[in-house]
Amino acid sequence: MSTNPKPQRKTKRNTNRRPQDVKFPGGGQIVGGVYLLPRRGPRLGVRATRKTSERSQPRGRRQPIPKDRRSTGKSWGKPGYPWPLYGNEGLGWAGWLLSPRGSRPSWGPNDPRHRSRNVGKVIDTLTCGFADLMGYIPVVGAPLGGVARALAHGVRVLEDGVNYATGNLPGCSFSIFLLALLSCITVPVSAVQVKNTSNSYMVTNDCSNDSITWQLQGAVLHVPGCVPCEKVGNMSRCWIPVSPNVAVRQPGALTQGLRTHIDMVVVSATLCSALYVGDLCGGVMLAAQMFIVSPQHHWFVQECNCSIYPGAITGHRMAWDMMMNWSPTATMILAYAMRVPEVIIDIISGAHWGVMFGLAYFSMQGAWAKVVVILLLAAGVDANTRTVAGSAAATTRGFTSMFSSGSKQNLQLINTNGSWHINRTALNCNDSLNTGFIASLFYVNRFNSSGCPHRLSVCRSIEAFRIGWGTLQYEDNVTNPEDMRPYCWHYPPKPCGIVPARSVCGPVYCFTPSPVVVGTTDARGVPTYTWGENETDVFLLNSTRPPRGSWFGCTWMNSTGFTKTCGAPPCRIRADFNASTDLLCPTDCFRKHSDATYIKCGSGPWLTPKCMVDYPYRLWHYPCTVNYSIFKIRMYVGGVEHRLTAACNFTRGDPCNLEDRDRSQLSPLLHSTTEWAILPCTYSDLPALSTGLLHLHQNIVDVQYMYGLSPALTKYVVRWEWVVLLFLLLADARVCA
């Protein structure tokens, strides 16, 4: 048995009454009645060594090593913490005015503002603040606040999805930079430039003022698919394209003023990165894009028609040119890399202090990727080119066999009270496509066309109408007299509906734009096979334009020999429409309104003011088109391919300058390896593969070139967004939410 005294239970009497340690928020404490300063040593990660005066004191409860916590995000939206953007005072007063009780909605631990960063702080502040204000409204505040909070959580889910999709890398900037950069490295299909001549519109390759993005003294950044045309005094001259969207006044002009801009961009981005204000600089850079206007150094006009008639190119020359450009990207990168040693010497000798400062700073930081970007950026300034091969000799194409004659029909036109129709005795309404009537259409050589000049005298050319402006509008209430003259391209048809089969002679053709024959049905749409003999047999022609509907319009002949039409609503090309002087466009009216395409405004067989869809009963419905020429075409409507033939009214005596050309939205067939087949005196809005421009034949009116030679240094596009993205990358600007 041990002789040691039995330990006594501690009570208030036998316990030494020593003052307890009192700790202060600043880190100091009172030990033995003496205030001790906060412990020395590192703040985080390592325990400080106890001083000699502290070693005799009892060690308190072991505190865990404090961890470094992000200072942003956790305090957002919690009670007692201020709202960002100085919104606390405003929201507090607004809540007090709206609800005397001043109750604040409870978000709980899932407050969207807890996970906000950078741009997300602004977004979540607005959405959550709106939800708080909704909750302050008396009586209905609870349901409205709940709905608003649900919307705020939904926005936060979208932001989290964006962060996850972009990789959620530290800073979140590099991944978004790569995504945006990939979207910029493209060779886009350029838009066709349109010139307003005050009376009509015409196609051109000259850049409009809206197409000029940025101007330097000797270079211009513009949208792809045009060439700047500068007017100096009374002379207009085309600039030299060095890429699809960069042009220079003379060779070498691009490098004269670009070095200063490179210095400014690099030094600004380096300072933003060094001062840790990359987010602020990036926001200022992005916001400035809305207000900065390009300086006006030049007067650009649309009078040159640059490269519109380049001359013919042989297939051998196109193959050689494409073979020389098999690897333009590798060649460009190799040329840049080979110039880096020379560029370093040029930077020092040329006193490019901005580039030198950026190279020095990012080298000390170990950001070698940014060093490479700056070197390649500087290397691209001094690049030049040398012509290797000369231009190919132009080849000519004869006029022989250019047009094929149309079909002829032995019919006679009758004028009854000013209305023209086919003689009733020539009609056999029961003929079908399998009888001898179709054969007679093509083998009868005589046609009495003496009434055609009188009949077509009421038809007007497109030049007779006023030019359009503004947004296209549809005319749903087309009211034409009984003889609405469908043989004139500019007479719009009435809306399609239900047509009794007994009033129709022959088949009903509808245009998708390919011609299709519509069969008879009953009122419910069930097909009937009685040749329209029953009174209940009808043609259901109701439809809207493709691709939403079935057809653009329909044509048939009634039992008295009159041609009838119906179609989708035509387009109003002017807000101040006047029926006597203005055009209700039922086709492609490019020369009066650049937005009036056949896809938007087409109402029947007329593809252009001079061309219509060819179909077996064309000469029965439109006998005065007997001398039209036939062309094979291909169109895409809503992703569906249509191969059909078109009949066009064009002879060699008709004018066909640029201002006389209509637009045909075709996917052209090929005449040869370098030539597209288009409708006569039109143009297709598909640019050439190599230049992005329109290249037409000056003498042959149905040829458009699909390939053109260009003095461009590179086929890739230099976009203004590249400059913004490089600045954001160098400045460490983060754009994640």
UniProtKB/Swiss-Prot annotation:
Provide the GO biological process annotations.
clathrin-dependent endocytosis of virus by host cell; fusion of virus membrane with host endosome membrane; symbiont-mediated suppression of host innate immune response; virion attachment to host cell
Identify the domain of life: Viruses
Whether Protein biosynthesis counts among this entry's keywords is no
Task: List the residue ranges of the region (Interaction with DDX3X).
Answer: 2-59
Which positions carry the propeptide annotation? 178-191
Signal peptide region: none
Query: Which residues lie within the region annotated Important for endoplasmic reticulum and mitochondrial localization?
Result: 112-152
Q: Does the keyword Ubl conjugation apply?
A: yes
Phosphoserine modified-residue sites: S53, S99, S116
What is the name listed in the Swiss-Prot or TrEMBL entry for this protein? Genome polyprotein
Its source organism is Hepatitis C virus (isolate HC-J5)
